[in-house]
Amino acid sequence: MLLPVIMAGGTGSRLWPMSRELYPKQFLRLFGQNSMLQETITRLSGLEVHEPMVICNEEHRFLVAEQLRQLNKLSSNIILEPVGRNTAPAIALAALQATRHGDDPLMLVLAADHIINNQPVFHDAIRVAEQYADEGHLVTFGIVPNAPETGYGYIQRGVAVTDSAHTPYQVARFVEKPDRERAGAYLASGEYYWNSGMFMFRAKKYLSELAKFRPDILEACQAAVNAADNGSDFISIPHDIFCECPDESVDYAVMEKTADAVVVGLDADWSDVGSWSALWEVSPKDGQGNVLSGDAWVHNSENCYINSDEKLVAAIGVENLVIVSTKDAVLVMNRERSQDVKKAVEFLKQNQRTEYKRHREIYRPWGRCDVVVQTPRFNVNRITVKPGGAFSMQMHHHRAEHWVILAGTGQVTVNGKQFLLSENQSTFIPIGAEHCLENPGCIPLEVLEIQSGSYLGEDDIIRIKDQYGRC
């Protein structure tokens, strides 16, 4: 059986304003009801696989857990990176964790933010790769190119491993992102693939090759795994150890150096959705080439991508535009300038704006909070607590809170006194009071929260007890 290893790090800044640091693109529902992470996992349906192992930023742990829970795939195989160190260390953490008890699984390493529309062809490529990975090869999947793309690295294939029609090829070399002329030559030659960043190999084989070529990375990752907190829900990698690990991609660290690399071609309508333009390319369009998502309307417009979170967006007489409207930001740009979105994100960071980092709607392990009004002296939040969810038992030094129940039933604790509130009832939480809100019901609990005080920062949450381990 295969062990899917899903790399779910990254911030996806080129898909701002929908993708933010605390809610990056792999968790977005850009196509249908599933997020890109969820699609990556459900795409494996029909193959013999273990429960997936997911590697993510520790700030995204509850997002990952909730999205896995929605698929009934939640397990304790969520590895939390305290800091990003690129793909070679991330895969090493997964391989070390997978071999802790003597096992040596076939690891299928996938990115959480790819689109692969032809699932049968993808499965066929996996079955081919499985045979050769089982024999000790390190398999990379090369995307059959259909354009002289300058945004991807390339893999040049060498000699065929066998004479069968579905043979993999030895890897001749990895090539950095080319200019347009060289990309055209690569496409015409028929000898090059796009580098997908997807792999398959035995866990111990990867570790042995890493030991040959980058023992410093292996040593740092081994120390981090040895000191990890293997809690009931997550595998927490210690910051003080892992931050010393070198930052290196698996291509540079292992795949370019090993003698055992082979490439399996994949022609399955793949995209890494690295920009709004790429998303327009792979999305269903109307007769004028427009992609409309959410509350959007167009007239005499062509080849536009319009995505509106909640406001109506009407576009008249425009073409080749990307218009993305969220609750707190609007992006308007020429579709050919998709790579410049990062400049907007850099501007927001430099000016200490919060829009690069988080949405107005913030996700918590107990549910979500929509910031309706935010001022220096008071905030108004619409809170949704999922069934069984609960705030931590906490207190604040500088703010009081008013809770009004909009729907459902809440169990409130204030300074040891416990009581129930139902729709249209309210309560007051004084400054310094120990308090907690729980949802004992089977439907979501909706609450209007008004915070008021001299300081409203998140660091004025003093947690006393928490069922999610945040104390």
From Swiss-Prot:
Pfam families per UniProt: ManC_GMP_beta-helix (PF22640), MannoseP_isomer (PF01050), NTP_transferase (PF00483)
Pathway membership, UniProt: Nucleotide-sugar biosynthesis; GDP-alpha-D-mannose biosynthesis; GDP-alpha-D-mannose from alpha-D-mannose 1-phosphate (GTP route): step 1/1; Bacterial outer membrane biogenesis; LPS O-antigen biosynthesis
Keyword Glycosyltransferase: no
Presence of the UniProt keyword Transport in the record: no
Domain of life from the UniProt record: Bacteria
Catalytic activity: alpha-D-mannose 1-phosphate + GTP + H(+) = GDP-alpha-D-mannose + diphosphate
GO molecular function: GTP binding; mannose-1-phosphate guanylyltransferase (GTP) activity
Biological processes per GO annotation: GDP-mannose biosynthetic process; O antigen biosynthetic process
Transmembrane segments: none
EC number: 2.7.7.13
Annotated keywords: GTP-binding, Lipopolysaccharide biosynthesis, Nucleotide-binding, Nucleotidyltransferase, Transferase
InterPro entries given in the database record: GMPP_N (IPR049577), Man1P_GuaTrfase/Man6P_Isoase (IPR006375), Man6P_isomerase-2_C (IPR001538), ManC/GMP-like_b-helix (IPR054566), Mannose-6P_isomerase_type2 (IPR051161), NTP_transferase_dom (IPR005835), Nucleotide-diphossugar_trans (IPR029044), RmlC-like_jellyroll (IPR014710)
Additional facts recorded: There are two duplicated genes for manB and manC in this E.coli strain.
Family to which the UniProt record says this protein belongs: Belongs to the mannose-6-phosphate isomerase type 2 family.
Main function: Involved in GDP-mannose biosynthesis which serves as the activated sugar nucleotide precursor for mannose residues in cell surface polysaccharides. This enzyme participates in synthesis of the LPS O9 antigen.
Protein name: Mannose-1-phosphate guanylyltransferase
Organism: Escherichia coli
